[in-house]
From Swiss-Prot:
Gene name of the record: COR413PM1
Annotated organism of origin: Arabidopsis thaliana
GO cellular component entries: plant-type vacuole; plasma membrane
Record's protein name: Cold-regulated 413 plasma membrane protein 1
Segments on the Extracellular side according to the record's topology features: 1-40, 93-94, 139-141
Gene Ontology BP terms: cellular response to water deprivation; cold acclimation; response to abscisic acid
Transmembrane spans: 41-61, 72-92, 95-115, 118-138, 142-162, 177-197
Length: 197
C-alpha cells in the first residue's frame, strides 16, 4: 500500500498501530510472567537452601546435646558443605575461615585436653571449606553432582532415622522424633526441589 493512501486512511493506520500495541502488551505480559516464574522458582530454591542448611546445623547441634540420636551425624558435614548458601560458604572459604581453621589446628595441637569433642565436626566443616580444591568447592558444589550427594545423604539419614524410630509412624510420635523427622525431611526436600526446578 503506498504511503499516500495510508495517510488518507486513518482507520487502517489506527488498526495497524493498535495491533502493534496489542502485540507489545502481550509480549510484555509474557515477559513479566516468565520473569516472575523464574524468579519465584529461584527464590524458592534459595529459601529451601537456607532451610536445609539450618536444618542440618540444627541436627548437628541436636546430636551434640543431651538428645543423642543413632544417626551418623558425620554425614551432615558434607551435606552442609554442598548445601551451604554461597554467602556463608564464601566467608568460610575466605580469610575468616582460614583464621578459624588456624586457631582450631593450634588448639588441637598444643591444647588437646581443651579441645572439646563437640567442636570436632564444626571445625572439620570449616577445614573442609578452606582446603577443598576449586573443582569440588566451585564446580561440584554448584552443580547437580552436589545436589545428588545431598539427596543421597538426606535419603540415607531419613531411612536410618525411620528404622531407628521403629517405623514411619513412630518417627512422628516420639518426643524428640518429630523435630528430627522434620529436620531430615528438609534435608531431602531441598535437593529434590533444586534438581527438578
Amino acid at each position: 500500500m503506498p504511503m499516500k493512501s495510508l495517510r488518507n486512511d486513518h482507520g487502517t493506520l489506527k488498526a495497524m498501530i493498535g495491533s502493534d500495541f496489542n502485540e507489545l502488551t502481550i509480549a510484555a505480559k509474557n515477559l513479566a510472567t516468565h520473569a516472575f516464574t523464574l524468579t519465584g522458582l529461584g527464590f524458592g530454591t534459595s529459601v529451601l537452601e537456607w532451610v536445609a542448611s539450618i536444618a542440618a546445623i540444627y541436627l548437628l547441634v541436636l546430636d551434640r546435646t543431651n538428645w543423642k540420636t543413632n544417626m551418623l551425624t558425620s554425614l551432615l558435614i558434607p551435606y552442609i558443605f554442598f548445601s551451604l548458601p554461597s554467602l556463608i560458604f564464601g566467608i568460610f572459604r575466605g580469610e575468616i575461615g582460614k583464621w578459624i581453621a588456624f586457631v582450631a589446628v593450634v588448639v588441637q595441637l598444643f591444647f588437646p585436653k581443651h579441645a572439646r569433642e563437640y567442636l570436632e565436626l564444626p571445625v572439620a566443616l570449616v577445614l573442609l571449606a578452606v582446603v577443598a580444591p576449586n573443582l569440588i568447592a566451585g564446580t561440584f558444589r554448584d552443580s547437580w553432582i552436589g545436589l545428588a550427594i545431598c539427596l543421597g545423604i538426606g535419603c540415607y539419614l531419613l531411612q536410618e532415622h525411620i528404622r531407628a524410630s521403629g517405623g514411619f509412624r513412630n518417627a512422628f510420635t516420639k518426643a524428640n522424633g518429630i523435630s528430627n523427622t522434620v529436620g531430615i525431611i528438609c534435608l531431602v526436600v531441598f535437593p529434590v526441589w533444586a534438581l527438578i526446578f
